[in-house]
Amino acid sequence: MTPLRSGIVAAVAALIADQASKLWLLFVFDIGHRGAVRVTPFFDLVLAWNTGISYGWFQTDSPVGATILLAIKAGAVVLLAIWMARSQTRLATIGLGLIIGGAIGNAIDRFAYGAVVDFVLFHVPLAGKTYSWYVFNLADVAIVAGVIALLYDSFLRTPAAKAP
């Protein structure tokens, strides 16, 4: 399998996993009516509608703001796809594919629902307080894994020979 094909497979896999998990939680498990569900002492399934970007930054309920965020995301996906098509290493193309698949998954949510569906909440009770991370989804996991793959690939690559 060529590196580009590996990246495309990663993008499609990330997109399918993300959308399947969200559709199942929303329409089969019906998390909207059930409310938060404790899965383990440190992990809950919750429903959070994120109208902003990462970590809830730039929250917007206006159609103009949502359109701007979608346009920025579409532009980023196009640039990432060009980078992926030109990439020479399998790890980089897989990383870029994961980022693209995650970005498209979240963009589908924003287009379909007006917000991104987040549902994973990790928390740790410590010294009488509960510390928690932001609520996220599988698209976010794919994006982070893709960035880690790109960073790892950049450290693995052998430096080009210096010109004489």
UniProtKB/Swiss-Prot annotation:
Transmembrane segments: 8-28, 39-59, 64-84, 91-111, 131-151
EC annotation from Swiss-Prot or TrEMBL: 3.4.23.36
Pathway note: Protein modification; lipoprotein biosynthesis (signal peptide cleavage)
Enzyme superclass (EC): hydrolase
An MF annotation (GO) of this entry: aspartic-type endopeptidase activity
GO BP annotation list: proteolysis
Compartment(s) of residence: Cell inner membrane
GO cellular component, one term: plasma membrane
PROSITE patterns: SPASE_II
Membrane topology: Multi-pass membrane protein
Catalytic activity of the protein: Release of signal peptides from bacterial membrane prolipoproteins. Hydrolyzes -Xaa-Yaa-Zaa-|-(S,diacylglyceryl)Cys-, in which Xaa is hydrophobic (preferably Leu), and Yaa (Ala or Ser) and Zaa (Gly or Ala) have small, neutral side chains
InterPro entries: Peptidase_A8
Pfam families: Peptidase_A8
Record bears the keyword Protein biosynthesis: no
Active-site annotation: D118, D140
Keyword Ubl conjugation carried by entry: no
Alphabetized UniProt keyword annotations: Aspartyl protease, Cell inner membrane, Cell membrane, Hydrolase, Membrane, Protease, Transmembrane, Transmembrane helix
Assigned protein family: Belongs to the peptidase A8 family.
HAMAP family noted in UniProt: LspA (MF_00161)
Physiological role: This protein specifically catalyzes the removal of signal peptides from prolipoproteins.
Identification of the protein by name: Lipoprotein signal peptidase
Organism: Nitrobacter hamburgensis (strain DSM 10229 / NCIMB 13809 / X14)
Gene it is expressed from: lspA
